[in-house]
Amino acid sequence: MNHQQTIEELAYRSGEQVETCEAVMKAYEKYAQHHLKKARRNNLEEVAQAVAQATELEARICENILTQFFDLLAERISFFNRRGGK
């Protein structure tokens, strides 16, 4: 699954626009670069809040998209469930 397919799948699952998903994932990538150990499902509320501030979107929208992202990762990468991603 390439980047565009991932974004389109997140849009489908979350019910949000493709552009919104793209913005959230771009902000999440930047957040993860600086907070690698925090950028996981265990810290979903904190991550969503940081992404919301960066994108000026509502935190609930960011949390929804990030939840769908973590679910997608768990489905596609079998060891992800054992590493604290879910």
Regions flagged by a language model, labelled:
Residues 1-86:
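Mobile acidic interaction elements
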